[in-house]
């Protein structure tokens, strides 16, 4: 099963992306026929060196690193891709529980991970049960995949308990910004990726 803290799968995925289809081709070779939301193929890549806050220099194509050539890739909304993947998973029998977050790791008697416990619902600001109280559920699993982001509280607990960072370089984090720009339609070129 999948526990999704958002109201629906994809609710917290705001990013657009340039999407390479290799993994999708392997999972769902008929993804086009199934209506995957990959509708805008990349037609060109432009890369600019920003000289200052007013001017940039376009890098010639022959100087563009191979990894920045997006031929065969698509410009997508990752929220839409995640929603579509959820539909495919449900069609294969995967149970998805939107609106629930994993609040605790469920450990087996031998100390191994045995699943998660979802958060209690129907509690007030002080954490006291209201009339609508529903205790968290124990979701037991042979395998548990934690996908809560780069600095999730359960991940931190597991890193500490199993000493996963022992002898490793510390993780580094940066702040990213997501913006939606309104631009003059005359300046828009469908399928153009600008770096």
What would you call each of these model-derived segments?
Residues 1-56, 63-195:
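Residues forming the flavin
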